[in-house]
A protein has these predicted regions:
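Hydrophobic ligand-binding cavity/cleft-lining segments
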Residues: 1-54, 164-167
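Short, surface-exposed coil-to-beta transition loops
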Residues: 12-14, 69-73, 95-99, 110
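Generic structural detector for well-ordered beta-strands
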Residues: 16-20, 62, 75, 88, ...
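A short, structured loop/turn motif at beta-sheet edges
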Residues: 20-24, 51-53, 77-82, 101-110
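Short, highly charged C-terminal tails/helix-capping segments
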Residues: 48, 147-167
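Short beta-strand segments that buttress and anchor functional surface loops
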Residues: 58-65, 85-91
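Short, cysteine-centered beta-strand-loop-beta hairpins and adjacent loop/turn segments enriched
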Residues: 64-70, 119-123
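Beta-strand/loop substructures that line and gate deep hydrophobic ligand-binding cavities in soluble
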Residues: 88-141, 146-148, 157-159
């Protein structure tokens, strides 16, 4: 039985999109190791542990939001295949919570993506703002790329080049 998607708490950004692909395909795209650089352009991901994306699994990464660059640790908080995935990124002065809720809808998938970006200290906040970084830009870019990849089956390298403005 599907787990209902909770309403996002105050301060958490949510964006919705419809993907013309079944939830299993969207889930597979979200966790495809070859697609990670394209799907998460703000992250330089370290190697995953064998259990990734299972809840409790961790991995390292380098996060770049706006002008801020920080080493972070990712932790998978919840992983329900073809249904839900939540993770948190924690680094020096920054915390980013991300969530994806996949719902079978009209032969495709309704994807609700959430993000909450929290910072400590004025410098961290200013570096993100000066570079025009935000949780909204992260989540909107991610959803656009996820939709393109899941629907069109484009190779990750092609989508990554387009996202970076090189193609």
């Amino acid at each position: 039985m599907p787990v209902p998607r909770p309403a996002p708490p105050p301060g958490v950004l949510e964006r919705l999109t419809y993907v013309q692909a079944p939830p299993r395909q969207v889930w597979a795209t979200l966790h495809d190791p070859a697609a990670q650089d394209a799907l998460f352009p703000e992250l330089k991901l370290g190697p995953p542990v064998p259990s990734w994306p299972a809840a409790g699994a961790t991995r390292s990464a380098r996060l770049r939001v706006g002008l801020l660059a920080a080493n972070v640790r990712l932790e998978s908080l919840e992983a329900r295949p073809a249904s839900r995935f939540q993770m948190i990124l924690v680094g020096d002065g920054v915390r980013l919570s991300r969530g994806w809720y996949l719902e079978d809808s009209a032969g495709g998938t309704r994807v609700a993506a959430t993000a909450e970006l929290a910072t400590t200290g004025r410098w961290t906040t200013h570096l993100i703002g000066l570079g025009r970084g935000s949780a909204a830009s992260l989540i909107e870019t991610h959803l656009r790329i996820l939709k393109e990849m899941a629907e069109g089956g484009r190779p990750a390298s092609e989508v990554h080049r387009r996202a970076a403005g090189r193609g």
